[in-house]
């Protein structure tokens, strides 16, 4: 873990593309000694959404691949475009409200699970929620994981925490943003353990749907 993680400024942002996220390096834990040395020198890390694998670190000297054949990684093009925008200064200063990522890939994955979007939405009462193009760091959850929220929600959460603290109450978040790929990964792991889609849906919302949006 980067030594400055706990003191990391709360204006940090996660930049989002379809398959890869751009994380501030101080917020990530190294999973191997070689990664630790690189992450200690990095300011940004490209992280695969499906399984959390670190794909590349961005150092002052340039891009450092952390996987073989980085150029062939699915979704690397849009992620590098985001990185170019970051280097060009487009993400400095007050940013515009985040737009939303397209949902085309999600529709295909729901079909692969045998789920009809409209039927599931009607049956569950849940709405399909597009991923935002970027998220704000709202602090850390109960397990000290970075808590990523939409900017307005991050401001509201921090204000609620401060107000509660004045009354002597400590508020902890359980979890924040989860990508569609992360949700899909939960399904894939449970399916591999022999559970059916119907059984998984008793515990987890379908990828792209959320019980925490209204």
Model-based region annotation:
Residues 178-184:
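Short, well-ordered surface patches within globular domains
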């Amino acid at each position: 873990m980067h030594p400055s993680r706990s003191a990391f400024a709360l204006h940090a942002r996660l930049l989002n593309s379809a398959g890869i996220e751009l994380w501030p390096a101080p917020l990530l834990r190294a999973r191997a000694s070689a990664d630790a040395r690189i992450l200690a020198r990095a300011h940004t890390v490209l992280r695969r959404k499906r399984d959390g694998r670190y794909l590349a670190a961005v150092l002052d000297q340039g891009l450092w691949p952390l996987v073989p054949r980085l150029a062939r990684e699915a979704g690397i093009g849009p992620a590098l475009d985001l990185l170019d925008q970051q280097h060009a200064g487009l993400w400095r200063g007050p940013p515009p409200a985040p737009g939303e990522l397209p949902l085309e890939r999600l529709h295909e994955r729901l079909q692969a699970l045998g789920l009809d979007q409209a039927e599931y939405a009607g049956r569950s009462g849940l709405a399909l929620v597009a991923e935002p193009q970027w998220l704000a760091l709202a602090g850390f959850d109960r397990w000290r994981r970075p808590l990523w929220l939409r900017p307005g929600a991050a401001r509201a959460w921090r204000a609620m925490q401060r107000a509660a603290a004045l009354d002597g109450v400590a508020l902890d978040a359980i979890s924040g943003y989860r990508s569609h790929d992360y949700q899909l990964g939960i399904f894939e792991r449970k399916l591999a353990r022999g559970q059916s889609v119907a059984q998984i849906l008793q515990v987890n919302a379908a990828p792209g749907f959320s019980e925490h949006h209204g």
